[in-house]
Amino acid sequence: VSTSRGSQGCFGLKLDRIGAASGLGCWRRIVDS
């Protein structure tokens, strides 16, 4: 599982519309970790 790459991707995607939804999920994973 590429968590590092996913985290960075979430930050960038968070700016996008669809990315915003994905970003939220990523944030939850980061907090859970």
From Swiss-Prot:
Its main location: secreted. GO terms for biological process: regulation of blood pressure; vasodilation. GO terms for molecular function: hormone activity; toxin activity. The keyword Disulfide bond applies. GO terms for cellular component: extracellular region. Disulfide bonds join 10-26. It is found in: Secreted. Keywords: Disulfide bond, Hypotensive agent, Secreted, Toxin, Vasoactive, Vasodilator. The keyword Protein transport does not apply. Expressed by the venom gland. Signal peptide: none annotated. Belongs to the natriuretic peptide family. Snake venom natriuretic peptide that shows an increase in perfusion pressure, urinary flow and glomerular filtration rate. Reduces total and proximal tubular transport of sodium. In the aortic ring assay, causes a relaxant effect in endothelium-intact thoracic aortic rings precontracted with phenylephrine in the presence and absence of isatin, a natriuretic receptor antagonist. This is Natriuretic peptide NP2. It comes from Crotalus durissus cascavella (Northeastern Brazilian rattlesnake). The lineage of its organism: Eukaryota, Metazoa, Chordata, Craniata, Vertebrata.
